[in-house]
Curated annotation (Swiss-Prot):
Cysteines paired by S-S bonds: none
Entry coiled-coil feature ranges: none
InterPro entries (alphabetical): Adenylosuccin_syn_GTP-bd, Adenylosuccin_syn_Lys_AS, Adenylosuccinate_synth_dom1, Adenylosuccinate_synth_dom2, Adenylosuccinate_synth_dom3, Adenylosuccinate_synthetase, P-loop_NTPase
GO molecular function: adenylosuccinate synthase activity; GTP binding; magnesium ion binding
Gene3D superfamilies hit by this protein: Adenylosuccinate Synthetase, subunit A, domain 1, Adenylosuccinate Synthetase, subunit A, domain 2, Adenylosuccinate Synthetase, subunit A, domain 3
The protein's name in its UniProt record: Adenylosuccinate synthetase
GO biological process: 'de novo' AMP biosynthetic process; IMP metabolic process
Length: 428
């Protein structure tokens, strides 16, 4: 049975949670493979809306096993807050599996994230201040703390001491802050480890055995393609690999086990934080999209930057991820527009670029080249097949598919779980 990767094809907030939940009804395991609690996603079930930041969105489904892979950085405090919140609403979380090799976000990572961002001033990246970057930096610098380190007091103390040696020097001498106490930090982490222990497992082994047994595994990426530390709009990116390749390194499953790569794209584009955004709308059209689409961050509450659909970005996402399918979300938001622009290429210093510039200075200078499609007025939330959509809406979808270089296999037509038109199966 297949290993299916689900990733964001733009700058995040594309509706991956809803797409994951849709596909998740047909799979046995849902595994997050990157990021931390810096990305939020919402899952709507009936009249209930669940805002998740760290837990896989498949946690809502009692018939599958949710997994947090080794590529995720885990803030235990946030994890327990989410578990407690769900269990208070009757959602059982006891089937959650957390990789013993995942790295921990310690309190000092959050402190450093906030202090460093303020220190950068106008050069800030626009982080959420939740310690994600510093935790990944420790991982690369080989001074990180893994989940299994929380179960050995002496070993943990040594690792915390090693990690804080340089950080305390920076806090005191560079940022004029107090040093962080090693003993107190160790005690706090040991207590968190006690509660975390029942969920901890060798998740790489679990997922590989599941695939060997013919189970279907969905690999759920946080953030999105354009925020990938290698393939995104560097340096305005996250600290991990949300692209399809990250599913393998972030779970311990080999690339030959992946049979389908599904990208999620909004029918328009949004972005949170700093960085270039060629189709961004700074006028009333952008505010209209923001209000119609309720474009405010799940994690931070920040208003999202909004713009028209960027086909150059989607073609790039298709290439980088090897997309087999696209799930197009929030098509309903565009109802009421007389005309809908689509960015088909860029103008960079007078030259047309049909593909993504590798030079970020060129990308920052890119001006969108638009073609315009007629809009529609009808409410499409009750449409259950592609043929039921208004003719101009169908034409818009077909044009996006053509420009993206990948088939559109499902369409989101509203906020509810059943507001979806399935065109092609994403599992078979």
């Amino acid at each position: 049975m297949p290993g299916i990767v689900l990733i964001g094809a733009q700058w995040g907030d594309e509706g991956k949670g809803k797409a994951t939940d849709l596909i998740g009804t047909k799979v046995d395991y849902v595994a997050r493979f990157n990021g931390g609690n810096n990305a939020g996603h919402s899952v709507v079930v009936g009249d209930e809306s669940y805002a998740l930041h760290l837990l896989p969105s498949g946690i809502i489904n009692p018939n599958l096993t949710p997994v947090i892979g080794n590529g995720v950085v885990v803030d235990p405090e946030v994890l327990f807050e989410e578990i407690d919140g769900l269990e208070s609403r009757g959602i059982d979380c006891s089937h959650l599996k957390v990789s013993e090799a995942a790295h921990i976000i310690a309190p000092y990572h959050r402190t450093l994230d906030k202090v460093t961002e303020r220190f950068l001033g106008k050069h800030k990246i626009g982080t959420t201040g939740r310690g994600i970057g510093p935790a990944y930096a420790d991982k690369i610098n080989r001074v990180g703390i893994r989940v299994h380190d929380l179960f050995n007091a002496d070993h943990l103390h040594d690792k915390v001491e090693a990690s804080l040696h340089q950080k305390n020097q920076m806090l005191v001498k560079l940022y004029n802050r107090r040093p962080i106490d090693v003993d107190q930090t160790t005690e706090e982490l040991l207590k968190l480890g006690e509660r975390l222990k029942p969920y901890v497992a060798n998740t790489g082994l679990i997922l590989n055995k599941a695939l060997d047994e013919g189970k279907t595994v969905l690999f759920e990426g946080a953030q999105a393609t354009m925020l990938d530390v290698d393939h995104g709009t560097y340096p305005f990116v996250t600290s991990s690999n949300p692209t399809a390749g990250g599913a393998c390194t972030g779970t311990g499953v080999g690339p030959t086990r992946i049979t389908r790569v599904v990208g999620v794209s909004k029918a328009y584009v949004t972005r949170v934080g700093e960085g270039p955004f060629p189709t961004e709308l700074l006028d009333e059209s952008g505010e209209w999209l923001r209000q119609q689409g309720h474009e405010f961050g799940v994690t931070t509450g920040r208003p999202r930057r909004c713009g028209w659909f960027d086909a150059v970005v989607n073609r790039y996402a298709s290439q980088v991820n090897g997309l087999t399918d696209i799930v197009l979300t929030k098509l309903d938001v565009l109802a009421g527009l007389k005309e809908i622009p689509i960015c088909v290429a860029y103008d960079v210093d007078g030259e047309r670029h049909d593909d993504m510039p590798t030079d970020q200075a060129a990308f920052a200078a890119a001006k969108p080249i638009y073609e315009t499609m007629p809009g529609w007025d009808e409410d499409i939330s009750n449409c259950h097949s592609f043929d039921e959509l208004p003719a101009t809406c169908q034409a818009y979808v077909k044009r996006l598919e053509e420009l993206s270089g990948c088939r559109i296999s499902a369409i989101g037509t509203g906020p509810q779980r059943d507001h979806v038109i399935q065109i092609n199966s994403l599992v078979d």
